[in-house]
Each structure stands twice: as structure tokens, then as C-alpha cells.
Amino acid sequence: MDQEAVGNIVLLAIVTLISVVQNGFFAHKVEHESKTHNGRSFQRTGTLAFERVYTANQNCVDAYPTFLVMLWSAGLLCSQVPAAFAGLMYLFVRQKYFVGYLGERTQSTPGYIFGKRIILFLFAMSLAGILNYFFIALFGSDFENYIKTVTTTISPLLLIP
């Protein structure tokens, strides 16, 4: 792979690798909680604490494929930097959701809502990239610079709760 191609995806790859480490952390928490209360073997049922850790992990795993598709679609079709920034924000929010779910379930709600907003932003970026492709193919008009400017300007607004 040449340097330019790698430069176009390196931030997305970094965010993806960080998300893999986070998944490992979540799985370790489930395993640790299972072994703490069930001895040496892993069991899917147990104490309330284990049920919370297991459910929080399962909820994060369920949303993970959608996150990866939106991250890479937005980064490849629109702009890498805002997509990677939104991806990092999503990982922080997912951590907040996971930790919040271990306490009161209402503590996980802000992370869940914020995560949905970030996924929607990544979806909008992907859609803008697809529309730009068709504008180029059909009309010869390239709006890529405008789209990159708008997404780069809007992405810091994701920090507002």
C-alpha cells in the first residue's frame, strides 16, 4: 500500500484498533465478574452485578457493527478527520454507557442518547459522500470541499451534551 492510500485511512484504522482494545476491556470485565462469583468457569447467569456487566457488554457488542460501518463509510466517502473525531467521541460515550450501566441504569441513558447522535452524524456524513458521488457522475459538480468544510465545522458540536 502506498503512503497516500495509508494516509487516507490511518485515522480510521487507529480508531478501529482503539475500539478493539475497548471490546477486550469489556470482555475482561465480564470474565472477571463471572469468575469472582462463579468460581473458575464462565457462566451466563449469576449475581445482579454479573447480569449488569454481561448486559452492558452485550448491548455494546450489538451496536458495534453499525458503528464500524458508519465510521468507515463516513471516513472513506466524506472526510477522514471528522469521522475519526466522531469515532473517538463514540468510544468515550460507549465507555460512559458501559460504566453507567454498572451503576444505576439511568446513569447509562446519557451515554446511549449521545451515542445515537454520533451514529446519526456519521450516517449523515456517509450520505453526503454518496450524494456527492452522484452529483459528480450526473451533473459534473463536485461539492467535496463544501462537505468537508461543513463536517469539520459541525463535528466539534458533538461535544455539546
UniProtKB/Swiss-Prot annotation:
Enumerate the UniProt keywords alphabetically: Endoplasmic reticulum, Leukotriene biosynthesis, Membrane, Nucleus, Transmembrane, Transmembrane helix
Q: Which residues form a coiled coil?
A: none
The segments sitting in the membrane but not spanning it are 108-115
Keyword Transmembrane belongs to the record: yes
Q: Which InterPro entries match?
A: 5_LipOase_AP, FLAP/GST2/LTC4S_CS, MAPEG, MAPEG-like_dom_sf, Membr-assoc_MAPEG
Q: Which residues lie on this side of the membrane: Cytoplasmic?
A: 31-52, 103-107
Compartments it resides in: Nucleus membrane; Endoplasmic reticulum membrane
**Top-level taxon in the UniProt lineage:** Eukaryota
**Bilayer topology term:** Multi-pass membrane protein
Q: Which residues lie on this side of the membrane: Lumenal?
A: 1-8, 78-80, 129-161
Write down the Pfam families for this protein, in alphabetical order: MAPEG
Recorded GO cellular component terms are: endoplasmic reticulum; endoplasmic reticulum membrane; nuclear envelope; nuclear membrane
**Membrane spanning stretches:** 9-30, 53-77, 81-102, 116-128
Q: Which GO terms describe its biological process?
A: leukotriene biosynthetic process
Regarding protein family, the annotation reads: Belongs to the MAPEG family.
* The record's note on its domains: The C-terminal part after residue 140 is mostly disordered.
The record's note on quaternary structure and interaction partners says: Homotrimer. Interacts with LTC4S and ALOX5.
Q: What does this protein's UniProt record list under function? A: Required for leukotriene biosynthesis by ALOX5 (5-lipoxygenase). Anchors ALOX5 to the membrane. Binds arachidonic acid, and could play an essential role in the transfer of arachidonic acid to ALOX5. Binds to MK-886, a compound that blocks the biosynthesis of leukotrienes.
Name assigned to this protein: Arachidonate 5-lipoxygenase-activating protein
* Originating species: Bos taurus
